[in-house]
């Protein structure tokens, strides 16, 4: 569960290392975002010569959370940290590589590119 002011790791090679959630998109007073939800983030830590710079406001999709996601068979998939993938205005990933596993819940029409780039799909 990601809320405003939550810090997330970036799971792609866009140049950002850490981002902070500034808004959960998808409703006027929506408080929490889970895996597969789109959030507005600001870049807090970035590497030199990256595609994004510190202070930029971007859109991102949540790919891993400590809270996890519950499957229909009752199992819960949790991760050690919260991570997101940065998106451009067309909701496509900015980076060309994805680091770490992603869940099967991202396998929708919008995020198939992220699933295909990921090294492991749980």
UniProtKB/Swiss-Prot annotation:
Q: Which GO terms describe its molecular function?
A: large ribosomal subunit rRNA binding; structural constituent of ribosome
- Which PROSITE patterns does the annotation name? RIBOSOMAL_L14
What the record says about family reads: Belongs to the universal ribosomal protein uL14 family.
Q: Which domain of life is it from?
A: Bacteria
The identity of this protein, by name, is Large ribosomal subunit protein uL14
Q: Which SUPFAM superfamilies match?
A: Ribosomal protein L14
Q: What does it do?
A: Binds to 23S rRNA. Forms part of two intersubunit bridges in the 70S ribosome.
Q: Which InterPro entries match?
A: Ribosomal_uL14, Ribosomal_uL14_bac-type, Ribosomal_uL14_CS, Ribosomal_uL14_sf
Give the organism the record lists: Pseudomonas aeruginosa (strain ATCC 15692 / DSM 22644 / CIP 104116 / JCM 14847 / LMG 12228 / 1C / PRS 101 / PAO1)
């Amino acid at each position: 569960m990601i809320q405003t002011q939550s810090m997330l790791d970036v799971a792609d090679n866009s140049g950002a290392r850490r981002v902070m959630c500034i808004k959960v998109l998808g409703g006027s007073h929506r408080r929490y975002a889970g895996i597969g939800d789109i959030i507005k983030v600001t870049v807090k830590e970035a590497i030199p010569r990256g595609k994004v710079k510190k202070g930029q406001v971007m859109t991102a999709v949540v790919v891993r959370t400590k809270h996890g996601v519950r499957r229909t068979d009752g199992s819960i998939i949790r991760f050690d940290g919260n991570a997101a993938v940065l998106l451009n205005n067309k909701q496509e990933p900015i980076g060309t590589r994805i680091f770490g596993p992603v869940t099967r819940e991202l396998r929708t029409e919008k995020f198939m590119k992220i699933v295909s780039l990921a090294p492991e799909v749980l």
